[in-house]
């Protein structure tokens, strides 16, 4: 588990950090689990947010745990998505002693080695048979929205991920806006999915060969979910829920 992560996504601390983390520590202290795993955005390890990272480690120490945190990329563990997240692992001190783990070797024992090859977006979604009505709904939405102007700048099937804020579009887009609207490269892992997978958002990942956002089936594949995984709500609610998930294959 963990608390909300948005305020550290861009390596900047906003809001009051006296938040759900301390409730998480309180519950951990009461439950006294042998091992606790927490997940947060990679930005928590950088810049001003690093102080919060250290407070997390020290907070676990105060309740009798040794904790480490490390940024992992879901693409290194079988997920067709470059999704970096910081995983904290806290082990109760008596358990550390029983199994012969100490702080010096904790990192190397706990975190798995990356796989040799990262799966690509094309490999993940090219065989999907989408609902034609859902595809058309997404295409129609772009044609009738502000997205159309920007996504049509970006070539299909690019060799690298493309954005309207790329330098070559500086004359058209001098403010370098729409920096989170992405035409992904099909032969690389997909960029990080966020709640911006909603059809209404100006940011988020579009299809590599079509002027639309990814369908729910495609989003599930990119997150590493089974095809028969059930999501509730309308399109935007389902897309948002996928974007907020921890990649299952990474956790496995």
Tell me what each language-model feature is.
Residues 1-182:
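Class I S-adenosyl-L-methionine
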Residues 140-252:
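C-terminal target-recognition/interaction regions appended to catalytic cores
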């Amino acid at each position: 588990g963990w608390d909300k992560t948005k305020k550290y996504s861009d390596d900047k601390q906003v809001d009051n950090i006296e938040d759900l983390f301390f409730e998480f520590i309180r519950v951990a202290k009461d439950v006294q689990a042998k091992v606790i795993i927490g997940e947060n955005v990679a930005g928590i390890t950088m810049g001003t947010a690093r102080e919060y990272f250290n407070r997390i480690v020290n907070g676990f120490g105060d309740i009798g745990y040794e904790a480490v945190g490390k940024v992992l990329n879901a693409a290194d563990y079988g997920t067709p998505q470059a999704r970096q997240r910081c995983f904290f692992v806290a082990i109760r001190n008596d358990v550390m002693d029983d199994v012969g783990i100490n702080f010096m070797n904790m990192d190397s024992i706990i975190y798995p080695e990356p796989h040799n090859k990262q799966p690509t977006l094309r490999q993940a979604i090219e065989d999907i048979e989408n609902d034609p009505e859902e595809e058309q709904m997404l295409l129609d939405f772009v044609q009738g929205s502000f997205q159309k102007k920007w996504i049509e700048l970006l070539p299909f099937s690019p060799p690298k991920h493309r954005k309207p804020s790329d330098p070559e579009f500086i004359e058209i887009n001098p403010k370098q806006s729409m920096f989170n609207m992405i035409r992904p490269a099909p032969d690389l892992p997909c960029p990080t999915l966020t709640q911006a997978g909603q059809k209404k958002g100006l940011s988020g990942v579009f299809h590599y060969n079509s002027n639309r956002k990814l369908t729910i089936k495609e989003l599930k594949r990119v997150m590493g979910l089974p095809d028969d995984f059930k999501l509730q709500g309308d399109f935007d609610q389902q897309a948002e829920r996928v974007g907020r998930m921890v990649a299952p294959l990474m956790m496995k």
